Structures are given as C-alpha cells and as structure tokens.
Amino acid sequence: MSGMGENTSDPSRAETRKRKECPDQLGPSPKRSTEKRNREQENKYIEELAELIFANFNDIDNFNFKPDKCAILKETVKQIRQIKEQEKAAAANIDEVQKSDVSSTGQGVIDKDALGPMMLEALDGFFFVVNLEGSVVFVSENVTQYLRYNQEELMNKSVYSILHVGDHTEFVKNLLPKSMVNGGSWSGEPPRRSSHTFNCRMLVKPLPDSEEEGHDSQEAHQKYEAMQCFAVSQPKSIKEEGEDLQSCLICVARRVPMKERPTLPSSESFTTRQDLQGKITSLDTSTMRAAMKPGWEDLVRRCIQKFHTQHEGESLSYAKRHHHEVLRQGLAFSQIYRFSLSDGTLVAAQTKSKLIRSQTTNEPQLVISLHMLHREQNVCVMNPDLTGQAMGKPLNPISSSSPAHQALCSGNPGQDMTLGSNINFPMNGPKEQMGMPMGRFGGSGGMNHVSGMQATTPQGSNYALKMNSPSQSSPGMNPGQASSVLSPRQRMSPGVAGSPRIPPSQFSPAGSLHSPVGVCSSTGNSHSYTNSSLNALQALSEGHGVSLGSSLASPDLKMGNLQNSPVNMNPPPLSKMGSLDSKDCFGLYGEPSEGTTGQAEASCHPEEQKGPNDSSMPQAASGDRAEGHSRLHDSKGQTKLLQLLTTKSDQMEPSPLPSSLSDTNKDSTGSLPGPGSTHGTSLKEKHKILHRLLQDSSSPVDLAKLTAEATGKELSQESSSTAPGSEVTVKQEPASPKKKENALLRYLLDKDDTKDIGLPEITPKLERLDSKTDPASNTKLIAMKTVKEEVSFEPSDQPGSELDNLEEILDDLQNSQLPQLFPDTRPGAPTGSVDKQAIINDLMQLTADSSPVPPAGAQKAALRMSQSTFNNPRPGQLGRLLPNQNLPLDITLQSPTGAGPFPPIRNSSPYSVIPQPGMMGNQGMLGSQGNLGNNSTGMIGSSTSRPSMPSGEWAPQSPAVRVTCAATTGAMNRPVQGGMIRNPTASIPMRANSQPGQRQMLQSQVMNIGPSELEMNMGGPQYNQQQAPPNQTAPWPESILPIDQASFASQNRQPFGSSPDDLLCPHPAAESPSDEGALLDQLYLALRNFDGLEEIDRALGIPELVSQSQAVDAEQFSSQESSIMLEQKPPVFPQQYASQAQMAQGGYNPMQDPNFHTMGQRPNYTTLRMQPRPGLRPTGIVQNQPNQLRLQLQHRLQAQQNRQPLMNQISSVSNVNLTLRPGVPTQAPINAQMLAQRQREILNQHLRQRQMQQQVQQRTLMMRGQGLNVTPSMVAPAGLPAAMSNPRIPQANAQQFPFPPNYGISQQPDPGFTGATTPQSPLMSPRMAHTQSPMMQQSQANPAYQPTSDMNGWAQGSMGGNSMFSQQSPPHFGQQANTSMYSNNMNISVSMATNTGGLSSMNQMTGQMSMTSVTSVPTSGLPSMGPEQVNDPALRGGNLFPNQLPGMDMIKQEGDASRKYC
C-alpha cells in the first residue's frame, strides 16, 4: 500500500490509503467523511470527463487502457483549448481541426456538442468506415434500412461496389486526402483530421439480388439512393494503433432530405454523331445516365424518333432540315420540337449541331449534335397516368363535346372523359348503351365514334401529335380521333384506357389523349386544347356545350377531320347540321350535318361540298386543315363564326343556344381569339357549308352565294337566313318541352362533344328549327333544317349531312324503299326529289314531330345539298380516307357521313345512318353509333341515345330519326342496346305519334334493317355482293362507297322495299323492348330474305360492319349463312364494319341470334351487345364491351390500316376483333398502338392470310372432305372446352385480346369446320355447336367461299376471336390448339380463313397456323395429322391448348404461320 508518494490521482490507490488509515481512527471524522465524499465525487467527475474526452474518434486507441486522473485532466485541457481554437477557426472560416494528436474529433466541422447528436443521428443514417483501399472495414447494422444490404454483406467489401460510378471520383477525393495525405490533409497539416460533407449515390440492393457485387454491371437497371455523407478522415500520423483503422474515412451516411436535395436540372441532354449523310454513327447518353432520371432511355429513344421522323404534311423531318442547315452554316439550332414520353410527360427538345471539319484538310468530317431536352411536367399531359386525367380534363371540354356524355359515360367528365367517355363508350357503351348508351353512346356517339376510330387511330403517335399539333397530328395520325374530337383520347385510351394513357405509344390511350387534345385544340397545341377544354367545360357548365366540342373538335376536326377521313370530314358537317355549335363542338356531328359539305367544312367546305367525293375530299380535308388552322387563328373568321353561331344560336335558341353556341364556341376554343378562332373558323366553315347546303339544295348559285357568304357575308347572311330557321327551330323546341327534353337528351347523346351540355339547347334548337322549318320554308327552311339537323343531328343532321347520300339513296329507295319507309311522307312522290324531300320532311318531322316537312323543296334542297356534298365527299372521303388509314374514320365517316347514305336508307337518312353508325359503332359502334345516329339524324347515336335516355321524349322530337336511330342503333347495338332498341320502340310509338304508323313501320323497318342489315350485311347477299367484292378489293373504301351511295341506296332500297314488311313485323318486336331478340330475329329474317337488304346494308355500311363483326356475327348469321358465307369472304373485310355493326349488332344479334339461327353463337356480339340480354352470353357481354371498345379502337386502327382490300377482310376480322376486344376488359387496356400494330400485322398477314385463307379454306374444305375430323382427343384437349367456354373469355383476356366467349365459340365453329370437332370436343362442340353449324353451314353453303366460310366460322369465332386475333387466336389456338389440332389443317386453314375473313381472323389464322405449328400440328401436317397427330400428347392434351394459350405468343407467330401458308 503506498505512502504519500503514491499518485493521489489514482482513485484506487487513494481509496486504499484511506482504508488503511481508517482503522487508526475508530470514529468517523467529519473531515475525513467530507474528504472521502469529495474524492468520490472527484473520481466520479473525472471518470465522466474521461468518457467524454475519449469518446472522440481520435482517442479510439486510448480505450484500451484506463487513463489516470492526470492524463484525463490534461486531455481535457487540451480539448478545451482545441475547442476554443476551433471556434476561432470557425470565425475565421478556417476549416482546421485541433492540432493535438488526441484532438477530440474532427470537430472542425462538427462541434463536440453536435457530435453526440450527430452520432445519434445515425438513426437517420448508417455509419461506416472505409480504409485507404476503399474496403468497408465497418458498417453499422442499420445499413439494411437504407440500402437493403446486411452488415455482413458489406463488411470487407469494396465501397465502390455500392457507389454510383459517377461518385467514385468524389469519394476517392474525400478518401485519399485523409488517408494518403502524409501530412497533407485538407489544411495541409499532416496531423490534422478533416471532416466534411459530400453527397453520393449508393446502390440499393435489388430485391431479387442478394449480392451487391453483381450490381455494377447492372447499374443501368439498378436503383441508387442519394446519401449525404459526413466524413472524417484520419491521417496516419494520428494512428498509433489499429493499423486497420489508419488512413480511414469514417462516414455517417443519411438520406438527403427532400428539401436539401439539389433540384435536378429540368433539362437533359445527350449527344449524337452523324455522318455527312445525316446517319447517326454514335450516341452518347452518359450525362443522362449519370443524371439517373427515370425513363431517360425512353426519352432518348423518343427524341431521336421524333427528330428523325418525317411528319405528316412536312417534306422533311426535323433531322433532315436541321442537317441541311448544319452543312450549310456549320452551326445550327433546330426548331423546338415536342413529343411525349410513354408516361405522358411532354418533352420539349431542341438540337444544336456543329459541323466538324478536318484540321488538316478542312473538309467536313462529321456532325456532332447536342440534343437538349426539357421535360414539361406541367404541360397538358402530366403522366401517362395523369394523361388520362390531365389530358382528360382538357379533353373534358373536348370530351365536353359531350359533357353530358361524359357525365353519362364517364361520370368524371374531366379525367378520363376521353378515355373514360370514349373508352367507356366502347367499353361501357355496349352495355350502358342500353340505358345510358344513348347518352353516353349516342351523346357520346361522336366521341364513341371517335373512340372506335381512335381506338384504331391511336396507332398514330398520338403522344407525339399531342406535343406537336394534336389537332393536326391527332386528326392526321388518328383520323378517327379527329372525327372523335370528343374522344380523341378515347381508348385510348383504352385506354386509352388502357391504359388510357398507354404510355408508350402513339396508340396508347395516352397517345390518344394527346392526340385528342391536339384534335380538340384545333390550334394543334395541347395548351390551346387545354384552354379550349377549360373554356368548353365552362361553356358546358354554362350550358354552352354545343360549340365546345365543336370548337375544339371542329377546327381540328375540320382541318384534321377533313384531312383524316370522310368520317372526320363528315363529323364536322354533322356538327353543322346538328347545330352550328354542335357541329363545331362536335366535329363529328357537325361534320355530318355538313356531311354534304362536311368535307369542305374546315375551309374547303364549299369545294368539298361541291365536289366532296373522292380525292377532292381528302385533299380538301388537308386543305381544310391547313386553312382550318389559319382560320382557327383567324380571329376575323372567328368573329364571324361567333356572330353566325351567336345569331344562329340566338335565333335558334335565344336563351341558351346563343350563348351556348357562341360561348361554347368561345369556351370550346378556349377563347374566340385563340382556339375559339379556330373553332369559330370551323363553325364558320360549317355554317357556311350548312347555309350553302341549304341554299345549294336550292341551286348551285345559292351554293356559290353561300360559299361567298361563308367566306365573308355568310356570317351575317347565314346568321340571318339561319337565324330565322334557327330561331324557329329553337322556338319549336320550347313548344314541345318533352321534345326539348328528349331533344336535349337526344342531343346530348347524339352530340356528345358539343351537345353534352349544350345538348338541351341544341336539341331545343332542333325542335324549334323543325317548328320553324315550316314557317321558314325555302332557304330559311332549308337552313333551318340544316341547322336543325346540325342541332338535332339526328333527323336534321341526317338530311343535312346525309342529304346527298340521302338524296341518292332516296332516289334509289324512293321506288322501293322510300315509299315503304316513308310511305306517309311521300308515298306517292314518284320523283326521287319528292321522295327525298318527303323523306327529309319525314326526318324533319320526326325530329320536329310537330312540324312535318313543311318545305319539301327546302328539305329536298337540304337533302340534296347534304346528300350531294355528302355523297361526293363520302365516296371521295371514303375512298381517299380509307386508303389513308381512315377506314375507321371511314366507318365513322360513314356513320356521320355515312349518315347521309345510311340515313337515306334508314331514315331515308336517319335509318341509313344507323347501320353506318353500326359500322362505325363497331368501330365505335356503341359510342360511335350514338355519334352516327347523331350525325345521321342521330339515327343510331341520337335515336339510340334518345331511346336509351328519353326514347319517348326524343321520339316526339325526331321520332323517325330517333326510332330509326333506336331501330338502327338497336340493330347495331342490339345486345348492348336492348334497352336502346326498346327505346327505339318507344321512339317508334312516339314516332307514330308524331308521324303516322308508317313512320313507325319505317322505324321498325329501319330498325330491323339496321340490325338485320347489320347482320345481313354481315351475312346477307347484299352485304356479300357489294360489300364482299368491294371489301375484298378495297376493304373499306369500296365497301363504304357502296354502302355510302349507290350500293346503299339501291341495296337499301331493295331491302327496304322488301324488308319494310318484314321489318314491320320485326318492328313490333322492336317496339317491345323485351322483344328485341324477336325483333332482331325478324329483322334478320327479313333482311336475310332480301337481296335488297344487301344493298341496304352496303349503303348503310353494314357490310363493312359485318365484315368487322362477321367473324363474330358469322354464327349469328347462320340463317344468313349463304349471305354470310358470301359476305364472309367479302365481309371478312366488311367485317370491320360488321364487327362494328356487330358491336351494335352483337347486342342486336343476340336478340336475333337466338331466333335467327346460330346467331346464338353470335353471343360474341351478343356478348358485346348482350348486356341487354344477359341470356345470350353474359360472359361475352361483359367482355364484349371491352371488345367493342377494342373493336372500335382496333376497327379504327384496322380501318386505317386496312383500307386496302386486305383491309376489308381485315376489317371484318379487325372489327370483330375490335368488337370482341372491346368486349374483353383485357382488351381495353391494350394499347391502341398494340392494336394498331397488331392490325398492321394482321393486315400484312391478312393479305397473306387472305390468300392463305383461300388456300387454307380450300385445304380446310379438302380436309373436311378428307374428313379431317379432330378426334375427341383433338378437340378434347379439355383445356379447349374449358378454355374455349370459360377461358374463352378469360382466354381472350389472357390473350390480351380477350375475345368474348363468343370468340371461343366462334373459334369453336371453326373447329366446326371439321365436323368431328364439334361432337368430339366438349369445348369444340359447344363452341362448334353455336358457331359450327352456322359456320359449317355457311362454309358448306358456299363451298367456293368455303375458306371464307370457314373463315366465317372462324370469322364468327375467329372473328370473335379475330377481334382479338392475337388474343383470340391464342385462346382459340391455345384452347383450340385442339381445335387447330382437331381441324389441324382446318383449324389453321379455318383459322387462317377466318382470320382472312377478318383482320383479326387473319391474325388468328396466322396465330392458329402458328398455333397449330406450335401445337405441333403443322399446317401441312394437320390434315395428315388428323386424329392421330391430334392424339399427340402435346396436341391432344389440354396441354396443347394450355401451351398454345401460353402460346398466345404463337399468335404472334401467326404471321409466320400465315406466311407459311402464303
């Protein structure tokens, strides 16, 4: 024990000494007690001090021993001094640390007081130590919370394996100075430590991967977390022990708080090198890669695509133009170009290029381009997700084209209106069509119409369009879209909707949306569109919905629609006819009214009007678009338009309409000056055209005058002349409140776009117009009629927009059909003119119920004018547009424009429209139909819509039209519109009220004809004769043309002539909503029995609709087998229409199907339209809606893509596909692009498959002949039955082109080709059961066409499947692998044939072929394969189908398979 010499600082020793002394002192001494207490406290504090002092990183080595009091105090003094020095240094902005070896911690940056909290803040981050070599010598356990790595995974690993490549340098810079600086620390003093903060990106362990080392190579696909590291470097000189810790970097890493995160530059850039020819030789995206912004690869890809793609209307792409400038100037900046990313984000890009010359020869060597990109997050399109919403909101106005429509359809007009509304129309339309369909469908008809078209059109790079000039791009790219200004984004938005915004593609809903925005914002700029949308919305909210869509849609539509296709052109006329505002608002509707002049509507309306048919129309369309744009920006024209619209509106409907029209126009344009001006121009053009039509109907001189007026005077003249009529019309509307309400509903339904909100106003306008039509007979009357048509869209529109077609058709039908259709109107009028007038009057009367056509001459003139312009544009439009991917538009056109041809037949104008709408409807049958109906006197859309909503109410307004619409719509949309048909029935009675029973008959006839025609068209001879050949030759142009004019007129006439009676019979069925099935059956029988029906169908565009829906309808048309067989060949293409028609007809057929024949099999459509009749194929029904949507989308795409003969066949399948696809919910999500691409593939395959079909069908026939019966095992692949029946739908869904069970059934019928298949395979047999016999019958009925028949069989199934050719084919093939197996060759052949029958069918065929091949049933081997090969486990087992189902991809292989066949 030591003496006094002992270190008293040593607590243990002091205590020992005390204890020794204690015995000497027996009693506790207060002094000693105090001393002891003090020493204890001293020791306690010294210990605490030691803990504090040695808690620093620098003293980490000192933890090995316990320092004595003296050392502790000494260290404390040092640290206090250091702290003071640090404070001084901080004041002097010196970032030096204490100079003492045992300096506290790198507190140069972090105070001692802050160190503890910072260390605790490790809760916010993790702690790690890195040595000089970059190895992680220690890492805290909570690293898992940040990087997902476990502590063990990172220990002794290289820190660079988790650091972003771009941060390695920064990290090394922080590591080396501390570790390598032998004295050269940040301050340059060897013994000092430096602490600093830097940011770096650390790899987050991929969920699947457990090792971080493999991530470097995956960097592009890895996720990095931005971390803020507080690092303290420890120089070697400080290290006394623990070599491992020498020269190490001690870091605390925490996530960078959002507020502290550096705002990433909104601009990004990448560089490319091009040779002197402009070809890209290298691409450097390192800067974008380092920025780690999401989607940069897509950004680069789309930027290059946009920059190097030659755009419509431009001779050179941006890249070529820019390259020329660079070569010429050495340095050049490109213009700013825009495009959309897959997520809908708008990007503005500019390219700066420099010509690099050789330093020696000074010769140009290459061009280096810097592409600067700026993401415009807040522009029209937010994200693909927001695109539907953001865009949808702007579109809302556009969609506002049918706010009511949106309300009906979409519920939330703003967001997905285009998508929701459009997609809803197609998707929901089919089922909702029954109740709301009209509103949504009819009202949104244009939208829907557009939807269907757009569904197909979205193929175009809508997103790009949106960026550029949505109005132009959208219309040009998406003709259908242009037409459906209201639902530009529609599917899109299947999407658009699909994915409404379906990110990537132009086809994506997003694309659609973009496009729609563009369309709506005729200015061709999303912002304009947005403004227009807002204005339109405002106007709509104010009740000025009329011009809204119009202005938005119209300018674009005008320019774009005209350009897009007859449909596009027609829609503006319809709008015009429907109402100045409506037409403007709803380019689609407005155009049909101007149908005659619709083509010229934009700016070439007069010209179009005069020579609207043919090339003039497309040219006019483009011209209109150009002019339209200039006019759009022509405030003067806009003012005139406003005046005209206002005057017209005021006169037509002083209170709401005037403001509605003008306001709507303004709103819809966003502002008269801006989009408004475009809209105004469009309206002005439409008004001019309307007046021209009105006056033109009187005489060419009047037309010229009108044209002149339209150019300058028309504003006032038209205003004045139309004003009276308009006023009258408006007055009449008020006169009949019920009518007004009906009109409102009808108008809303009919005029989705513009009439959504302004519908009531417009409808009143229509009514009043009708009412005043009598007073203001003559030019005013005509004008009023036109206006009324514009306003009402149904009767008036049809007469106006379809006046030409109507006139022609009336001429054709007057002898046979018109008298029957309109016996009371002009039963005794032998002259076509009289008949036409009578029909027009009828239509007008139907619309105005109370005012029978007072001025026959005026009406006649109007009809004539419209028809003439309509007819002319129609053929030209159809022909021109069809070639231009306007098949869908064509269909749409036919719907609207077709309203002319169709209405003449159907309603003498209204009815005609219905089939076409049906066609369109199948394209966008349900939605389109309403549109068509609206366009064409709202036959389908309007009548349908009205019947759906206020069938009775509307009936008075335009009973005939409504009824016709209803009937037609019913026919078209039977399944979906069971209610609609019933409404039509109601409409018919109403019609009967307003007009004699004959009208009812007419409606009934029309209805019957509509459905029958649609179906008959699909299957009827008329369909086959005209549709088939034209379709085959010129898929839609010819089909449409025949449908449009002569074909339609003559055929319709016959069908009407014969079918009126038959139709009259069905009419009662139609009258009884519950008897829709019977009515359909009757209609079908009636239509089926008349060759004239074929013509009617054609005139109505039913053949095309049938083509579209033929595959699906084939079964339905078992009764029509012969015609179907014939049709299926042609209808294969016509079936695009067919499928559209079938969309409507699907519902229609379901009613008919059960009674008609194997139409029961038609459940495909039934499924589509079966909603009203769950009985047929509820499953299919649900899917049908998506199918309809898809059908519309696909139909458009296919129509555009299948404008050629291929297109006709493809159309059939395509439309069927569309129909089926819309029916399949899964379909809806499919990108428009995918559809478009598929359709393209199908088109390509279709040509091959068409040939293949014939070959395959022949083979199939041969195989059948050979008895290529699939053994039960073949058919048996139980998977088949299951897959076919249930999977049918699921399969369809699974297939992405989920075809309704009908598809499976349809496909089953294909198997039906092989007689054995049906009985052998439960799936096959049930499926075959429906489809097979009809199909087989049809196929057998037409041995020559047998391949097509088979195709038809397939077309029915395959068509059903066709809709989802790829999908269907797989389900078909997957499940039907058996089918393929059982009918191996047959299936392939049938499949092929069917596919040939329809676009999808083609694909299916191809798919089946490939499927068959996949199923190891080579096409060639299929026959030989027979039951035996079918017995192959692969083939026989459900596996075959399962495999094939998965093999849906095989469908993709279809092309190859079909190629093989080819």
Curated annotation (Swiss-Prot):
Q: Where is this cross-link: Glycyl lysine isopeptide (Lys-Gly) (interchain with G-Cter in SUMO2)?
A: K239, K648, K705, K731, K785, K1452
Question: LXXLL motif 3: where is this motif?
Answer: 745-749
Note down the stretches annotated as region Interaction with BMAL1: 730-1121
Give an example GO biological process: regulation of DNA-templated transcription
Q: According to the UniProt record, list the residues that bear Omega-N-methylarginine.
A: R1259
Gene Ontology CC annotation, any one: nuclear body
Changes seen on gene knockout: Animals show a glycogenopathy resembling to Von Gierke's disease with impaired growth, fasting hypoglycemia, and an increase in concentrations of triglycerides, cholesterol, free fatty acids, ketone bodies, uric acid and lactic acid in the plasma during fating. They also have increased liver glycogen stores and hepatic steatosis.
Domain of life where this protein originates: Eukaryota
UniProt KW Metal-binding keyword: no
Q: How does it assemble?
A: Present in a complex containing NCOA3, IKKA, IKKB, IKBKG and CREBBP. Present in a complex containing CARM1 and EP300/P300. Interacts (via C-terminus) with CREBBP. Interacts (via LXXLL 1, 2 and 3 motifs) with RORA (via AF-2 motif). Interacts (via LXXLL 1, 2 and 3 motifs) with RORC (via AF-2 motif). Interacts with APEX1. Interacts with BMAL1. Interacts with CARM1. Interacts with CASP8AP2. Interacts with CLOCK. Interacts with DDX5. Interacts with ESR1. Interacts with HIF1A. Interacts with NCOA1. Interacts with NR4A1/Nur77. Interacts with NR4A3; potentiates the activity of the NR4A3.
This protein is called Nuclear receptor coactivator 2
What's the source species for this entry? Answer: Mus musculus (Mouse)
